[in-house]
Amino acid sequence: MHSSFIEQSSKTVEVFSTSVSSIEQAEFLLDKLQEEFPCYEINFDLEDCDNILRVASVGSNVDAEMVILIMEKHGTEIQIL
């Protein structure tokens, strides 16, 4: 009898409110964040009243401080929720 072991990696997610208001601005910032964090899953929800940014990482913690620094460097207000 063959048994298999499935390793499950934990995923960490950080959620931020932002001042991003346009798709163009979101796409620009996504490019900048993906350059710095190619392994993160990153997306915006601009339909939410807080213009949510979600950042997920599998197997390691999200570097929230660096995400905030990159966003602020590009003139975006951001706050971790």
Predicted stretch roles:
Residues 49-55:
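Surface-exposed aromatic
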Residues 57-62:
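Helix N-cap motif at beta-to-alpha junctions
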Residues 4-22:
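Short glycine-/aliphatic-rich beta-strand segments at the starts of folded cytosolic domains
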Residues 29-33, 65-73:
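Short amphipathic alpha-helices in soluble, non-transmembrane regions
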Residues 43-49:
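RNA-recognition motif
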Residues 43, 74-81:
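Conserved short beta-strand edge segments in small beta-sheet-based binding/regulatory domains
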